[in-house]
Amino acid sequence: QGPGMDLFHAVEQQIGAQNIMAEDLGYMTESVKKLLADSGFPGIKLLQFAFDSRDGGGTSYFPEDYPPNCVAYVGTHDNDTAVGWTTSAEPEDVKRAYDYLGVTDAADINWVMMRAIWNSRANLTIVLAQDLLGLGSESRMNKPSTVGSNWCWRAVEGCFTDALAAKVRGEMERFGRLDRPDKKV
């Protein structure tokens, strides 16, 4: 049993209110769920988790179920890239994703998945550079509980082009994600 909200109140007294997000992935006890609710901190939603057959693909991970007060990802540094996920995940999970997203193959799956979270009500979305670039498993950042090749991926000079920046800006305009000062995270 930790200090609960007393810890966050003490931190706020010392350094003021901060934008904090809670990593609420994995097993959550009722007391942790209550602490998250009491704190008002946004939790995390991972689109890849929506298709995970090992846990029934909880509906809370489908973008239409995201509350505004959350941070949405396709996957985090601990997951495979969107493109890599299509070959590393269970085939039935990939099929579920294709069916849900309305696609028949992995062509542009990174953009399709990013658009799904951008179209959600999540106040904040974060995408991996590797997903913006359409990279596969070879660029995965971290594989939890392993040693050796984690945290080695580096962007190469010139990979972030003006064309990519224009495409991202167009997507942000399309989904109303530019200059949203009214949105608190």
What do these predicted regions represent?
Residues 1-185:
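Catalytic cores of glycan-processing enzymes that make or break glycosidic bonds
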